[in-house]
Swiss-Prot record:
A Gene Ontology BP annotation from the UniProt entry: translation
The protein, known as: Small ribosomal subunit protein uS5
Record keywords, A-Z: Ribonucleoprotein, Ribosomal protein, RNA-binding, rRNA-binding
Lineage: Bacteria, Pseudomonadati, Pseudomonadota, Alphaproteobacteria, Hyphomicrobiales
Keyword check for Cell inner membrane: no
Signal peptide residues on this chain, from the entry's feature table: none
Similarity comment: family membership: Belongs to the universal ribosomal protein uS5 family.
Region span, Disordered: 162-191
GO cellular component: small ribosomal subunit
Subunit structure comment from the entry: Part of the 30S ribosomal subunit. Contacts proteins S4 and S8.
């Protein structure tokens, strides 16, 4: 009976793990100086997401590469963040984030644009399930800083529902204001 339950738990865990996509962003060889010399190990940076709006990143260190990747993946799954996507494919609004000397600017993009982003940011967007986004990184190109800056920006992303609740307005009122503020709205009305 207990063995059957244990097997079922393992199957559930494997099923949960299979829904996630993990991307290895960076591997670094690190050294610890000890009395007898240097002890070498590896550090891994991994991004994990379900391609439905949840994403996380993790850092793992170990003597062997596969063990470092496994630790980083587990850390990423523990720190998943939900991001509200517009139409399930892009951001609701432009947003910027920073961490250390790394700064990123994320812009919502029209359908068919694709993911225009470099290096570590691309891994985050692919794991998130985002299809259309334009991103620019400024300052530091360190993958750790870029990933953290990207997550900082994504945490600042708000859905119209969240903004309306915070302001005490209806979502339709916000969307009407957005349509009025779009460039070219006056030209379309005049025609």
């Amino acid at each position: 009976m207990a063995r059957e339950r244990e097997g079922r738990r393992r199957d559930d865990r494997e099923e949960r793990d299979s829904e996630f996509v993990d991307r290895l962003v960076h591997i670094n060889r690190v050294a610890k100086v000890v009395k007898g010399g240097r002890r070498f190990g590896f550090a891994a940076l991994v991004v994990v997401g379900d391609q439905k709006g949840r994403v996380g990143f993790g850092h793992g260190k170990a003597r062997e590469v596969p063990e470092a990747i496994r630790k980083a993946t587990e850390a990423a799954k523990r720190g998943l963040v939900r991001v509200a996507l517009r139409e399930g494919r892009t951001l609701h609004h432009d947003v910027a984030g920073r961490h250390g000397a790394g700064k990123v600017i994320l812009r919502a993009a029209p359908q068919g644009t694709g993911i225009i982003a470099g290096g570590p940011m691309r891994a985050v967007f692919e794991s998130l399930g985002m299809q259309d986004v334009v991103a620019k990184s400024l300052g530091s190109s360190n993958p750790y800083n870029l990933i953290r800056a990207t997550f900082d920006a994504l945490k600042r992303e708000d859905s119209p529902r969240a903004v309306a609740a915070r302001r005490g307005l209806k979502v339709s009122t916000l969307q009407a204001r957005r349509r009025d503020a779009e460039p070219g709205a006056d030209a379309a009305d005049a025609a």
